[in-house]
Amino acid sequence: MKVHFIAIGGSAMHNLALALHHKGYQVSGSDDEVFEPSKSRLAKHGLLPDEMGWNEANISEDIDAVILGMHARADNPELLKAQELGLKIYSYPEYIYEQTKDKTRVVIGGSHGKTTITAMILHVLNKCGVDADYMVGAQLAGFDTMVKLTESAPVVILEGDEYLSSPIDRRPKFHLYKPNIALISGIAWDHVNVFPTFDNYVEQFDMFVDLIEKNGKLIYCEDDAEVKKVAEDSDNDISLFPYSIPPHVIDNGVTYLLTDEGKIPLKVFGEHNLVNLNGARLVCASLGVSEKDFYNAIQDFKGASRRLELLGSSKKSAVFKDFAHSPSKVKATVEAVKKQFDDRQLVACLELHTFSSLNLKFLEEYRKSMKQADEAIVYFNPKTLKHKKLPPLTKKEVKKAFARKDLVVITDSKELKEYLLDLSWKNRNLLMMSSGSFDGLNLEKLAKKVTR
């Protein structure tokens, strides 16, 4: 099988390319830029393009499948050549489905918690010796790649993103997987550049539920009123399995589950993670994992990459970084750290980096999301607004949107670093939240200075 990737350098795309290479496929690809870690990983397996850029000469009649990434544009010369030759062109999710259509497909959907729930499921299945393929949105400890596709595994666990499939396929990715078992963790408006209204966004989840295979299962968080409505209003012939936060206690900085199997210590914390864990438990039960085996396996789960990651700690302070960027994720993450360390003050810092978060109309969704922080800081780079072709934001507008008069708004990375290092860190924790990089701020070095 000969497969060509247009935009092979993307996080998801290069992992799929590696998975197909390991499967014995003949893989080629192109991109206009490839960054680390994609660059080294592709080069290691001889898949890094010799030259950067697009070239229609890369497309020939003997290619069995062309996989088109979101980074490419609809007028991409390689895409146009493939269309001219009548080659089969797939979006990333379409090809994932093509590779997994004969397996039991488990799809984890929702506005938040998808990666963590998927990671929890894979961690448990791995420890319990259950053979499963997977596709997940972050690099996980104990797993070499973010995509695994084999002929032998009877089950595949897929993280189901609601963003668009490709430049020429405007369907949300998770509409293409046709799950046998689906999970919805929560619904909170996101991707406003694609779904301009909340109702339009919710509609995508209605359609997702309708696409669950006949006699399939929907596992859903009943604490979320919108999810509950989507699940219970569906006419699809499926079984419903609700979940919510499990009984637990926090003792001396450690969270314990209170279960029929006894008191289970965890390495993760935060109510949102406990809810995620309960959803993962129901998925694993659907795949034949006993409660006893689940609880034994989940005890040493340390969390998904970039989720409440501990960068440094001392007796007086700790520094965490988290991928949180949407309002619901920010609120849950701030509350988790504050509740886990209720004897310490919390300084929470959020970078506005995505199209949605920098959109003034959407910014009001962040109202009181950082209420539990003793000090709240919002950082954004005005150049990012220009790059995304959005109108300028003022500090006053940001403060008003967050409904917090004492909110500190900073627009220069060096100034942010200096501000944080000037604070006293006795009995104080720092939480840095972003899907970006705070414009290159070295958080590991910052953590060392804060906790020394």
Where are the model-predicted features located?
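Short, charged/polar "capping" segments at the starts of alpha-helices
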Residues: 34-39, 57-58, 73-76, 142-143, ...
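Fold-independent oxyanion-binding glycine-rich loops
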Residues: 8, 30-31, 69-71, 92-93, ...
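Phosphate-binding loop of NTP-binding sites
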Residues: 19-23, 57-61, 70, 74-220, ...
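Short pre-catalytic strand/loop immediately N-terminal to key active-site residues, enriched for Gly-Thr
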Residues: 264-269, 317-321
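ATP-dependent carboxylate-amine ligase
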Residues: 1-36, 42-50, 62-66, 82-87, ...
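Short polybasic amphipathic segments
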Residues: 254-259
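A generic structural signal for residues located within well-ordered alpha-helices
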Residues: 116, 272-278, 325
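Beta-strand->loop->alpha-helix junctions that form or flank phosphate-binding loops
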Residues: 51-54, 90-97, 135-138, 234-252, ...
